[in-house]
């Protein structure tokens, strides 16, 4: 199980926007969190939120199964990271 922690200082998202190579404007909401990958220290990462999704509240989370998908050639891939509160 992958453990994710959102600290109180990370309870908001930042918006990154611009124009794609195809000339279309885009906007992404990103939130910082720490992911425990089993090493000595957790790793600070950015997760992209779904459009209209509020920021995750501070707390402990795990990765929801909908974050994974099967790729074109049958390999397991990570899709957009979605979190659920840890029990």
Swiss-Prot record:
UniProt xrefs under InterPro entries: NA-bd_OB-fold, Phage_M13_G5P_DNA-bd
Key word Ribonucleoprotein present: no
Site, Involved in DNA binding: residue positions: 16, 21, 26, 34, 46
Molecular function terms, GO-annotated: single-stranded DNA binding
Keyword DNA-binding: yes
Keywords, comma-separated and alphabetical: DNA replication, DNA-binding
Marked site positions, Involved in DNA binding, and in the dimer-dimer interactions of the protein-ssDNA complex: 41
GO process annotations (BP): DNA replication; rolling circle single-stranded viral DNA replication
Alphabetized Pfam families for the sequence: Phage_DNA_bind
Superkingdom in the source lineage: Viruses
Oligomer status and interactors: Homodimer.
Family named by the database record: Belongs to the inovirus G5P protein family.
Function statement: Binds to DNA in a highly cooperative manner without pronounced sequence specificity. During synthesis of the single-stranded (progeny) viral DNA, prevents the conversion into the double-stranded replicative form. G5P is displaced by the capsid protein G8P during phage assembly on the inner bacterial membrane.
The protein's name in its UniProt record: DNA-Binding protein G5P
Organism expressing this protein natively: Enterobacteria phage M13 (Bacteriophage M13)
């Amino acid at each position: 199980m992958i453990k994710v922690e959102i600290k109180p200082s990370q309870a908001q998202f930042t918006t990154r926007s611009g124009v794609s190579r195809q000339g279309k404007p885009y906007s992404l909401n990103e939130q910082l969190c720490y992911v425990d990958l089993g090493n000595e220290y957790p790793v600070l990462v950015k997760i992209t939120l779904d459009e209209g999704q509020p920021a995750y509240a501070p707390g402990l989370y795990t990765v929801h199964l909908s974050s994974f998908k099967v790729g074109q050639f049958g390999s397991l891939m990570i899709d957009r990271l979605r979190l659920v509160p840890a029990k």
